[in-house]
């Protein structure tokens, strides 16, 4: 082809898909579509260094913003069991209505049922609020274990960026929780249980059961009907429970004595209301209050007209949102049907490909929804100045440092000796990592494993960037040491609680833990000394030091002729070994104090133990 034309090639392929394309055409197509076009290979390599501090800054900005967003989202999060089902009335109006109604029925004489009903409503509100606080506290402790972060200090507007996220967050949650629980309990329990059971049980149970049912039915029905009728239409539940409780309580309570009314009414009302409300729910339209446009799966299951032979499969598919989305995606994409069929027929061939490493499998199972990304993106945009200031105060990077590179020299790639000489000759003059790139080929500068193995690290000039790069390297070392200490103490605690590892565990780890990642943070000797000390960190450290001393003594004694310095070192090491062996007998809550006593003009060492302040 004299001149390559992609449009013409595409037209020909669409008209006749069986048309063969020449190798030259494919090569031209590849060069036109590939941003990294192929050039003629060169036999020379160039030495260069580059810095990508902008990328490092962006990573830390993203990290700072993500942590702030997670804490902000936790503050605004309300557990599912405390979310409002409906907010038609407030707690105050419900209580006023209840008191006025029962005052008229009891001729202004306070009834025990009035007090118990109010207490039941308040107790329900308190219980749900307490559950919400406990859930948030648990999640907050988990986040702070992984992210030592204070959104009040680092990004103040993290939860004041929107009108509803500002100071109204606390009051809104408090008012919502109160009004929500009030509405749920008041609408359901008051209208259904109070009026129904009050009128029904008083007329039915007569004077013997009046005092018993007044307190029992209110408490029992309040808690039972509250959980069952929470998702049920108020008017429907009221009329249904009214007719049901009249017949049920009348027949049951009439033949039941005062001592058994509590269990009887609780069981009858729970079973009766559960059956009735299940039928009501099946024929009632609901929406997810957190997403009004979406019908919850458990509601959708009840509204579906499913044949008996498909019921088990539909239940399994709609058991979780993930399963439902996966099945729906496969059904809507015909091109996946054959591939999914092949995958299910031969899962062993597909698993190593789709889940090639443990980290890949973990990430593929925890895919964040798109709305989370957009919420996070909005949070970054709305708090950008604060997040930049926080990032610059936490980390030494500045946002105005960009990508830069420098080329030092070009040598022939076949002369490996000359390449090595360049590295060592200029090691005191080059300020950054040195990479060798092949001329005529594109070189990816990302942090790939192959690239990291080719870098040589030299630092001398350019103090500003040098300090930043040194800080980056120091962060890596500190992070590794912190991680190592964390693993060491957790392993010690594990040994204290469950004992040493099983004999076959080391074989299992060497067989299955083969993917790249954090390895060998604790040596074999350290693990053995931890087991020898039964998880006692202090004794394990002494055992480590004893091993070091014994190894040093062994090396010195293996030499034939020791120098004076080596002899002094041998004597010193033996004394350190003896002292370490004595330290093994020191209790954990005490401190050993060496005292020297003059005994007939001869100094003798005595040991004194003093209580340690823990």
UniProtKB/Swiss-Prot annotation:
Residues annotated as signal peptide: none
Region annotated 28 X 4 AA tandem repeats of [CNS]-[AV]-[DNS]-[IT], chain positions: 161-284
One Gene Ontology term, aspect cellular component: host cell cytoplasm
Keywords for the protein's UniProt record, in alphabetical order: Host cytoplasm, Late protein, Repeat
Entry keyword annotation includes Repeat: yes
Protein localization: Host cytoplasm
InterPro entries given in the database record: SDr-like (IPR050972)
Induction: Expressed in the late phase of the viral replicative cycle.
Domain of life: Viruses
Sequence repeats: 161-164, 165-168, 169-172, 173-176, 177-180, 181-184, 185-188, 189-192, 193-196, 197-200, 201-204, 205-208, 209-212, 213-216, 217-220, 221-224, 225-228, 229-232, 233-236, 237-240, 241-244, 245-248, 249-252, 253-256, 257-260, 261-264, 265-268, 269-272, 273-276, 277-280, 281-284
Record-stated family: Belongs to the asfivirus B602L family.
Task performed by this protein: Plays an essential role in the assembly of the icosahedral capsid of the virus. Allows the assembly of 3 molecules of hexon protein p72 and formation of a thermostable trimer.
Protein name: Protein B602L
Natural source organism: African swine fever virus (isolate Tick/Malawi/Lil 20-1/1983) (ASFV)
